Curated annotation (Swiss-Prot):
One of its GO terms (biological process) is cell division. It comes from the Bacteria. Transmembrane segments: none annotated. Prevents the cell division inhibition by proteins MinC and MinD at internal division sites while permitting inhibition at polar sites. This ensures cell division at the proper site by restricting the formation of a division septum at the midpoint of the long axis of the cell. This is Cell division topological specificity factor. SUPFAM superfamilies: Cell division protein MinE topological specificity domain (SSF55229). Disulfide bonds: none annotated. Keywords: Cell cycle, Cell division. The keyword Cell division applies. Belongs to the MinE family.
């Protein structure tokens, strides 16, 4: 297989480059978690409590995110509601 890779000009990615790519992904993930407001988990719990009073929902289905658009912070809530 290595001979075919050599003949076809395909090179394996060096371990240093692979480690660098993995580290960049890890850092990006940590930065995105760190930028989330501290109050978001508590807000999620409270929103779930209010919705659960009226409808039976799967708590894992609720997704809350805060994004910035046009200079404003936007709270986005995604939830699949059951059929009646």
């Amino acid at each position: 297989m290595a001979l075919l890779d050599y003949l076809l000009g395909q090179k394996k990615k060096k371990s240093a480059n692979l480690a660098k790519d993995r580290l960049q992904i890890l850092l990006a993930h940590e930065r995105s978690e760190r930028s989330a407001p501290e109050y978001l988990p508590k807000m999620r719990e409270e929103i779930l409590a209010v919705i659960s009073k009226y409808v039976t929902i799967d708590q894992e289905q609720l997704q809350i995110s805060i994004d910035e658009a046009n200079g404003f912070e936007v709270l986005e809530l995604n939830l699949v509601l059951p059929d009646k």
